[in-house]
């Protein structure tokens, strides 16, 4: 599997409030550029929209330690979505038969491995940013 080298560092800090506010500010910056749902255009999917709001719903299902761990890689994940042309691992979602899961691998500027998951609806071809998490 090829890995995308990100040019952006992960968020620094250990406090949840600090990291959450930094990540949320990034999300709001993107949100102000769109009329409806915030999205990023993906280089791999031929500049298709990847909607970002589903990530936040998914994040609230995790405990606070896991949220911090995932939010640290949020800027790296956005960079990967926008610029990566590397082939992901794609498979059918075992929980929903009408979805495909795409898993991209990336390295932060600090050389730390992380993964980004994007779901694609087979009927509507709509793609959503589901999750970002480090290797461990």
Model regions and ranges:
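Ribonuclease/tRNase effector modules and their secretory precursors
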Residues: 1-136
